[in-house]
Amino acid sequence: MESLDSMLTDPLELGPCVESNGTGIMEECMLGGTRVSLPEDLLEDPDLFFEVVSRDTWKNVLSDSQREHLKQFLPVFPDDNANQQEKIIQSLFRGDNFRFGNPLHIAQKLFRDGHFNPEVVKYRQLCLKSQYKRYLTSQQQYFHKLLKQILASRKELLDLARKNGPDQVLKKKPSSLRNTPEERETRAQCRYLKILREVKDECGDGTLSSEEEDLSSWLPESPTHCPSVAVPLRVIPTLSTQDMKTADKQEFTNHDLKLLLRRHREKRKRQSDHPDLITDNLSMNDIMTRVNAGRKGSLAALFDLATMKKRVKEKDDKKKKKLKTIKTEVEDYPDMPDEADIMPAVLPPETPQVTLTAVKEEPLEDVKPPLPFNEISACFFCLLLDILTMEGPCSLPLLEDKVSDWQSLPASTLNSWFSVAPNWCDLVHPALIYLSGECKVASSSFTPFVEFREKTQQWKCVVSSSDSEKELVAHFHLWLETKDQIYSKENEDCIDASTPIPRVRTDYIVRPSSGEEKHVFQEQERHRYIQPHKAFTFRMHGFESVVGPVKGVFDKETSLNKAREHSLLRSDRPAYVTILSLVRDAAARLPNGEGTRAEICELLKDSQFLAPDVTSAQVNTVVSGALDRLHYEKDPCVKYDIGRKLWIYLHRDRSEEEFERIHQAQAAAAKAKKALQQKPKPPTKMKSGSKECSLKLCGTPEPAQLSLTESSMPPTPGTPGTPTPPALPSTPMSPSTSATVNKIVASTITETQKSSQSVLLVSSPAMPQLSTLLSPAVTSQSTSVTPTSGRAATISSSTGVPQVRIVTATTGVPTTQSAAVVTQPLSPVISHIRLPVTTTPTKALAQTQVVTVPVKNQTTIGASRLGASVTTQGSVTVNTLNSSAGLASKSVVSSPGASGPAILQSITGQSIIKQVALSGQLGVKSQPSSSLPLSSTNFRIQGKDVLRLPPSSITTDAKGQTILRITPDMMATLAKSQVTAVKLSQELFSAAPVSTTGKGLLHVTSSPSSPSPPAPSTIKLTPEMKPAETSSSSFRLMPALGISVAEQKGKVVTAGESKPATTIRIVQGLGVMPPKVSATQSITVSAKPVTVPSSTIVNPVHSASNVSLPTVNSTAVKTAPTGIVVGTGAATVRQIPVTTTQQGKLPARITVPLSVLSQPMKGKGVVTAPIIKGNLGANISGLGRNIILTTVPAGTKLIAGNKPVSFLTAQQLQQLQQQGQATQVRIQTVPASHLPQGTSPASSKAVSTVVVTTTPTTKPTQEPQ
């Protein structure tokens, strides 16, 4: 046995079947108690098995000792044993039959069927063991029963011998009949039927009654019946469960049918509740469908197909039948003289021989069985549905045969529509296409009557013809009228969409490429992608394949961007090499332009841009998705043929010139589309990087002036992206004017917005135009504005002294009073920003102001035409007309001792932010004649370093506080930039208790008209309050910026000049806070007196002057104020909102920015600080480019995206929220009682506010930019 084990485990026995790398699939087999691993192919493939187990292996592979060991298992012969064993071995390998088959063939079948599997062997042994136990048990029972019978018989014989003696003959007793009720009933039935049959035979009656038929089912088979002819069993070898089914069908006779019916009646009589007998919900169609469904894929379907072919042959044979003569010959019977001699009397007398003549065989008429469907139908569609209903799902050829059989019947001509078409067989397929709803003429409401099954290639009826006969007739007449047009159109479409003929025919079959072939292809591929914008021709394997240019590449200049990462492609490839382009090239290289997906994968593997460690499964998956994408392109290059299961390259008939012509057309279309999508850019740019208006200089710099009238305002609400150029009215100009402004561009579009999907920008409907203008060399004369132009502002300049005039139109007040003018030296060129603002009208005064603010540029501005560079410096001069007696004046006074003028400074560089913000009166309707509709207006001119905050960083807590979360990365980014934010404390607005009445009166006073500079005037906002309550507070800036805080009254503290210049930006609108101002605020600028109207935010930038922001107690105006003085070393940008309140209206919210940049960092946590306290108002802005929300009037439009948009309604806000453009934006109605103290209007009406809320995140998103 040890030698057998070594032989079975010897590698020589397996031969070439075992792969050297061990990747072959092995199967374990149990041979004689030894577990052996054999290749699966060896066991499954008979040819391979007999190649291994062969005579050659016996002679050349096995050793002599192994052969001698195996010969021991052969039978031993007494004579000539060696030769006999050799003959047996030869017969064994030849496949001779050893009476019960060849042992090698039997072994191969056992190997193939898995009988040597260890598990099978185990269970077979257990089964044999169980059968042996059962056998032993049955043997025990048999012998036990036999023993009892023997003992009983022995006793009986002994008793008989003892009684009768030896001479008595033994009489065997017959076995007792079983008297069970079933046996008695059976005998009675048989006896009854026997008597009944004998009576009927005597009477000659052959009919049977129903009772007799039921009784006849008990009749046993008569022994006189001839045994039926045995049907040969032709078993088709297969692995299915139908191995034992007969191949030939048994024909049922009438006798068999009667027996079947009798058994069915008996079954119904005895088992009425059997499931097979419940036929309440069954119909004939269901039965036919169930019967036909069983034939699919079975052997019966194969034989039905063979029977159908035989019928077709029989039809052809019948057509070829001719008259045939039957040749008969006279048969000569052999003489039997012996018998004639023996019995002469028995033989009849001889009769003359009759010669049989030839008889003509007349062809019998073909008697066709009646069709299962009605031959007369309402229309052709009904006929087709009847055929499908009776036959079940049918293929197109079978339907055409059925229609042909129907057309050959005489009854078919009785249909009124029969003569419409000469051959209805040709119209079967078009009619089915129409009934399935796939026809192009069919309407969208068309209900299909049939459907086509792609898998089985069969048509199935889905609607019964009897249920919709009228509808079918109407469709039939419509189809007859339009079928010719449909066919012509479909034929043209088929011609256009037909598979193109390949340019070069080839018999090449795709196979793995050799190293040389792969090298040749990669070289061609390299040349192909050197010029991706041109077509290329691959020349491989004796044929050419033309591919078009790479889609989206229209010029030779390649992109410097890095290619997108792909798991299958190399990272160092060109950016335009994608998996789609490579699959397109592989499909183009298919031989004859068609092939399978596996062939495309094989061609793709030759590409040099594939990663080296890519597997075939990954390539197959990616190619599958790429082919689907190519299949659904606008101009698809591939399509899938379902019938042949091949991918077809549709562009194989195109030439390189045709490809390039189409590509050039696509390039032109893409260029035109891109030009339409681009926005109009400003004509010129500042060198500083801020997109502003450039100037058109001619000759020497001379003065220029601009007037902004009402016509410059947009008449209807619109987006800032569509600015309206302001008109230039005729105003007095200096004689030396030689430079004019040529273009005015809205400031809201000067900054290109960066794309951000998490940004919602909403701006006001009334967008006043902001323009940056340059003023040439100034003259010594000043011009004024006619008082009637209440909505205009002019710049009147003298030599080095520009002026900004604020014209206030009042009702009932003469406007002839002179204006206070302050002049300052100015450089030859100046830039201005014009800001129209609106004040709250009182009962006696309605004011409209337009402020023109000059902008100083620290760097040189290059003129586009002259090439000269000039340096500008300017000042602000605001004049106020005396309104009426008894009104308080408001002014901003600049000190003559200041070291520099007060200017709005424009700083160059990529990290500079310029911001101009306007704030108006909320809840106050502007006067149509004298005021500008500037309610809640936000304008922003920003640089490129605006921090983009994600929505998750802006949250609102349960108390209504808006929380701004800034990550350490954001703080580090801002700390490096030149822009530094400042924290504005709330103490400025809590100096005194707020009036309980909620009223605020604005007192306007003006200085007497005189050419000399008037005394400094103050802006007083005096709420009604108790005189006893006095307090003061100061405007605090963070010490980290080098700005000292004035803690004592009357003391001025300045910052050190050694500090570097820092731009402090107080961003408007991070939150809204109700005004708690309880003292008169005065803004004093150390310069000549200028007057600033109320409801205006002035953004002065102090270059070298001091700004004092004191708060004055309303009851003690003469008290020395406390303030903050910004030193000359720090350039600040300050926004100071001054608002008024009108009874019955909601006052404007004072914008209180609050930043956390000056907060000390503790660890890596997130710095969180409240923005505001109280409810959110209608003006939320200043979060970089993130959110600007204003009040929402009805009937305005929404433009989603990252551009500033108009007002939006509550419904549009809801739509925007559903689209994911905003986190949570809602309009909230706040009752008057819930408003903070001091901000509630006199009326108890609810106020609608826009609230932006976001869900706070546990881990904020860190975005550096």
UniProtKB/Swiss-Prot annotation:
Residues 670-693, 705-738, 1000-1033, 1234-1265 are annotated as: Disordered. One of its GO terms (molecular function) is DNA binding. GO terms for cellular component: Ino80 complex. Residues 714-729 have a biased composition (Pro residues). The keyword Cytoplasm does not apply. It is found in: Nucleus. Keywords: DNA-binding, Nucleus. Residues 39-156 form the DEUBAD domain. Residues 1239-1265 have a biased composition (Low complexity). Belongs to the NFRKB family. Binds to DNA. This is Nuclear factor related to kappa-B-binding protein.
